[in-house]
């Protein structure tokens, strides 16, 4: 295998791990770093493919759980669910493009039992342009490896605080 293919497979795997439901690692530094090494399109496509696989896993795991919980409770759709139902594809795609956290919108898709194909398509439609932009930024702005490490550590702080911070009873 070529170094480029190995790099794409590594980015695919990392993108999967950084986008699966309860991910604890940031994806931005990896995409920025891979851009100049793998090329803009190769980076964006590998990262998007990993994201879509993570979306399939999330959907397969969480939609049945959420459906069972809602059936037990007998809860009517709330205001946010009704708002989401107006344009779910656009909302998911737009939230995937922005730097806003994606998980609240994913949760809305799960509670709405949004179909798998559309869900994955919406995430790909939002994430591909984001990854293209991040990969391009990695090519356009030559950043030293130490800065990528610092960015990764900085983005890990919220996760570390959640995992290892003080517990409130």
Predicted ranges, named:
Residues 1-13, 36-119, 128-131, 136-169:
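Membrane-interfacial helix-loop-helix
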Residues 14, 18-19, 126:
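Hydrophobic transmembrane alpha-helices of secondary-active solute transporters
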Residues 30-35:
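Hydrophobic transmembrane alpha-helices of multi-pass, membrane-embedded glycosylation machinery
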């Amino acid at each position: 295998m070529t170094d480029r293919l190995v790099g794409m497979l590594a980015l695919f795997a990392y993108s999967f791990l950084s986008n699966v439901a309860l991910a604890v690692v940031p994806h931005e530094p990896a995409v920025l770093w891979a851009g100049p090494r793998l090329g803009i399109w190769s980076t964006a496509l590998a990262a998007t493919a990993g994201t879509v696989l993570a979306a399939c896993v999330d959907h397969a795991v969480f939609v049945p759980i959420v459906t069972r919980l809602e059936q037990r409770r007998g809860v009517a759709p709330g205001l946010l669910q009704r708002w989401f139902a107006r344009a779910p594809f656009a909302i998911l795609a737009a939230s995937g493009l922005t730097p806003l956290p994606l998980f609240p919108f994913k949760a809305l898709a799960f509670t709405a039992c949004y179909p798998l194909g559309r869900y994955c398509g919406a995430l790909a439609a939002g994430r591909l342009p984001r990854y293209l932009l991040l990969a391009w930024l990695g090519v356009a702005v030559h950043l030293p490896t130490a800065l990528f490490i610092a960015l990764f550590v900085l983005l890990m702080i919220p996760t570390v605080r959640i995992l290892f911070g003080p517990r409130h009873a």
